[in-house]
């Protein structure tokens, strides 16, 4: 069985747009031809696609950085550069995507084939055909391609199982899964045997079926991260029904009612309160001598608390009570599904996450040396980055735009004089009043 990976961190870099072209028409019968530089192509975006054939995030364990292709540069004769192909990355159904730095939820891939654009490719820069005016009929101005979005993401996988098996370690969850499905979990009589979730399909004689997940054992404090718990409580979020297994082994040194309440408290304390999910109480390991006496006490304790929910007594070793439990579980799953149908949820096939951009005029000036200044601002840095500085026309256009945005005034307020160095992003300019 492959290692189960249900949380990982990756970096995604969308492609840069192609640069616009500075070119002019040079044809035999067209003297003094005008501008003919084409636009650059758009950069490739990075798109997640939900794939029902994947079960883990293992593909991202050894490769953490993904980069889409850049767009082609514009060409002569007003020809556009070719746009880059988008990079599609397959993720398991049930993957939730967060911005690693802010913790913001970007998207939730819950349907097969659902897509999520997590990094958008930059637009292509405009060629000089766009900058001709009555004053400047032959502009040597073109834009560089826009940089693609660069993000650090946190991916979480939450299993999409109809039924989740919860309980203390070694209460028989893996054994129950193995005798009711074709899943082959590791089984042994010691704590934390199950270190990874196992998923199987229960198929009943009447044709009904449901998926069931054996989740690693919980202990007190799991919702706060004690033991393995919080890593796996997230998988319970998507289940329709919980089978809460309580061991009737009289030799484990624990009271059944205390075990039951401990797990219930952990479910309730989790961030999204899992205690409201439909639950069947299962008294497991009834084949062990003395289990009947412990079961009687457990039922008596529940009655004292006015808990009249039925308790299913089973033995996965002898299969006693398992058939009825599975039939009643299937019925409960159907009931929950009918309740959910009454509140239909529309799932977008393709979603593009819109990252929040700062205000266009938002920038700050910092004096870092006697004659050195740094201007910081994401939109401003992008403007400089997209300006083709190989031509004087482009430099003058940038200077005019910076002045209109108030950069010159802000520099003077900080004490900048002629000849001082001004850094914007990766570029350094000489300040001229």
From Swiss-Prot:
GO terms for molecular function: GTP binding; GTPase activity; magnesium ion binding. Coiled coil: none annotated. PROSITE patterns: G_OBG, GTP1_OBG, OBG, OCT. Signal peptide: none annotated. Residues 355-433 form the OCT domain. One of its GO terms (biological process) is ribosome biogenesis. Its cofactor is Mg(2+). InterPro entries: G_OBG (IPR031167), GTP-bd (IPR006073), GTP-bd_Obg/CgtA (IPR014100), GTP-bd_prot_GTP1/OBG_C_sf (IPR036346), GTP1-OBG_CS (IPR006074), GTP1_OBG_dom (IPR006169), GTP1_OBG_dom_sf (IPR036726), OBG_GTPase (IPR045086). The keyword Oxidoreductase does not apply. Residues 161-334 form the OBG-type G domain. GO terms for cellular component: cytoplasm. GTP binds at residues 167-174, 192-196, 214-217, 284-287, 315-317. Transmembrane segments: none annotated. Monomer. HAMAP family: GTPase_Obg (MF_01454). Belongs to the TRAFAC class OBG-HflX-like GTPase superfamily. OBG GTPase family. This is GTPase Obg. It comes from Lactobacillus acidophilus (strain ATCC 700396 / NCK56 / N2 / NCFM). The lineage of its organism: Bacteria, Bacillati, Bacillota, Bacilli, Lactobacillales.
């Amino acid at each position: 069985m492959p290692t189960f990976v249900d949380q990982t961190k990756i970096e995604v870099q969308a492609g840069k747009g192609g640069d616009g072209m500075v070119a002019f028409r040079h044809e035999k019968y067209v003297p003094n031809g005008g501008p003919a530089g084409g636009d650059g192509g758009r950069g490739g975006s990075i798109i997640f696609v939900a794939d029902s054939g994947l079960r883990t995030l293992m593909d991202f364990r050894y490769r953490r950085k993904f980069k889409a292709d850049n767009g082609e540069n514009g060409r002569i004769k007003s020809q556009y550069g070719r746009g880059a192909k988008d990079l599609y990355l397959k993720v398991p159904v049930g993957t939730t995507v967060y911005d690693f730095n802010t913790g913001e939820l970007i998207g939730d891939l819950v349907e097969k084939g659902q897509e999520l654009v997590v990094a958008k490719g930059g637009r292509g820069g405009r060629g000089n055909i766009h900058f001709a005016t009555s004053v400047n009929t032959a502009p040597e101005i073109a834009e560089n391609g826009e940089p693609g979005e660069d993000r650090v993401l946190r991916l979480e996988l939450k299993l999409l199982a109809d039924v989740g098996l919860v309980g203390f370690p070694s209460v028989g969850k893996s054994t129950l899964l193995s005798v009711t499905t074709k899943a082959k979990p590791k089984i042994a009589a010691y704590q934390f045997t199950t270190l990874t979730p196992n998923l199987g399909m229960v198929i009943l004689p009447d044709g009904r079926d449901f998926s069931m997940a054996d989740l690693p054992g919980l202990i007190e404090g799991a919702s706060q991260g004690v033991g393995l718990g919080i890593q796996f409580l997230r998988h319970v979020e998507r289940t329709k029904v919980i089978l809460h297994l309580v061991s009737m082994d009289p030799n484990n040194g624990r009271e059944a009612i205390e075990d039951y309440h401990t797990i219930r408290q952990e479910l309730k304390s989790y961030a999204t309160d899992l205690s409201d999910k439909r639950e069947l109480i299962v008294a497991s390991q009834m084949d062990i001598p003395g289990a009947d006496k412990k079961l009687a006490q457990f039922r008596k304790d529940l009655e004292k608390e006015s808990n009249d929910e039925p308790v299913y007594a089973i033995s996965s070793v002898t299969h006693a009570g398992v058939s009825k439990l599975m039939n009643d579980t299937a019925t409960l799953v159907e009931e929950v599904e009918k309740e959910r149908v009454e509140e239909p949820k529309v799932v977008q096939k393709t979603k593009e996450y819109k990252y929040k951009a700062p205000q266009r005029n938002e920038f700050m000036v910092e004096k870092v040396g006697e004659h050195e200044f740094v201007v910081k601002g994401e939109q401003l840095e992008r403007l400089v980055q997209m300006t083709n500085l190989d031509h004087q026309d482009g430099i003058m256009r940038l200077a005019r735009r910076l002045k209109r945005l108030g950069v010159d005034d802000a520099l003077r307020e900080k004490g900048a004089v002629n000849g001082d160095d001004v850094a914007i992003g990766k570029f350094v300019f000489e300040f001229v009043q």
